[in-house]
């Protein structure tokens, strides 16, 4: 079930990212799994003209993505010439910012490419951790990056998300009564909150009974582990 939930919160972080974009600074967008790094970048992609690379450990996929976004044909160039042409195009492009989404462990080859890009245009790295054993080859570069950290939702942000989902009739109005439970169960994690709201939208759970809430949480876990299974009652 694909649920279109409203994007709420993160106003402070969005304002900071817009400021850093204007200043042409490198950015390390840091946050644990589910904090909404990709969703935040997607909100800014079109307004700021971001060039977002896919989450990949393969340099070829990232290079192909950048070539496509810059309107470059692959042609018959060998890999070295393609790389040099791409870097030259990035340097000559106006107001380009390259985002490497989900930049986890980077190999020496990929890390070297990211460094080459960062010498020509501002780079944003979306990572779950800034520890060297998690990010790999790019770790020495991070001293040049401004840190923007996404933390768990405050209860008021959870309330805003639930209220927005109710207004858009994504979930029933009764959901407002369990906002505190939702925030506690998700520990403020936006991804888990959205998964719980998705389960509520299926309409299979009695939100007024503790047993119904336990089943709601169980179904969320089941859909997380086995996303292809419907688990419909």
Specify the residue positions occupied by each region the protein language model found.
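N-terminal pre-P-loop "Q-motif" helix
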Residues: 4-17
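Walker A/P-loop nucleotide-binding motif
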Residues: 23-41
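Conserved alpha-helical scaffold flanking the Walker A/P-loop in AAA+ ATPase domains
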Residues: 78-93
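Conserved NTP-binding/hydrolysis module of P-loop NTPases
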Residues: 50-53, 59-77
């Amino acid at each position: 079930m694909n649920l279109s939930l409203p994007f709420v919160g993160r106003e402070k972080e969005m304002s900071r990212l817009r400021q850093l974009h204007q200043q042409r600074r490198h950015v390390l967008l840091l946050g644990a799994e589910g904090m909404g790094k990709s969703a935040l970048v997607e909100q800014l992609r079109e307004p700021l003209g971001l060039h977002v690379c896919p989450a990949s450990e393969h340099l070829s996929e990232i290079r192909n993505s950048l070539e496509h976004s810059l309107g470059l044909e692959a042609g018959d160039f060998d890999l070295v010439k393609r790389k040099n042409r791409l870097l030259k195009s990035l340097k000559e492009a106006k107001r380009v910012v390259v985002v490497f989404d989900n930049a986890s462990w980077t190999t020496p080859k990929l890390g070297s490419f990211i460094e080459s890009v960062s010498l020509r245009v501002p780079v944003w790295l979306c990572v779950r951790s800034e520890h060297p054993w998690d990010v790999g080859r790019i770790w020495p570069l991070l001293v040049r990056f401004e840190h923007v950290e996404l933390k768990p939702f405050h209860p008021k942000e959870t309330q805003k998300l639930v209220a927005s989902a109710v207004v858009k009739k994504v979930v029933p109005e009764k959901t407002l009564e369990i906002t505190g439970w939702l925030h506690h169960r998700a520990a403020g994690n936006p991804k888990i909150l959205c998964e719980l709201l998705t389960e509520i939208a299926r309409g299979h759970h009695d939100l007024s009974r503790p047993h119904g809430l336990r089943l709601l949480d169980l179904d969320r876990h089941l859909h997380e582990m086995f996303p292809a299974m419907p688990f419909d009652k």
